[in-house]
Amino acid sequence: PMSDEVVERVLRAVEQVPPGRVVAYGDIAALVGTSPRRVGSIMGSWGGEVSWWRVTNAAGRIPLHLLPLARKQWQREGTHTDGDRCLISRCRADLAQLSADYRAAVADLS
C-alpha cells in the first residue's frame, strides 16, 4: 500500500521543478526514496494538482493521452521539445537545486 506521506513527498518534490524545466520519474524517485514506477503511479492518481507536465520518463515522454495538454504547457513555459517529447538533456532541472528545494519543502514532514 502507498503511504500518504510518500504521496505527499512526491507531490511536494514535483512542485519544486521550475517552469520550463523537466525531471524524470527516476529523478523524483531518487529524491523521495521510492521507485520510478511508484512515482508514475502517484502522478497518475494524484498529480493533477501539481505541474505534472514537468515529470516525464527518461526519454522525455509523457503518457499519450496527456500529450496535447502537456504540449500546450511546454510551449507556454518555453520547454525544449522535439515533436512528442521534451528534450530532457536540454531542459532537465538542476538536480542539486531541486534536492535543496525539496528538503526545505518537506521539512515539516520529518
Task: Provide a role label for each language-model segment.
Residues 1-110:
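Nucleic acid-binding interface residues in structured DNA/RNA-binding domains
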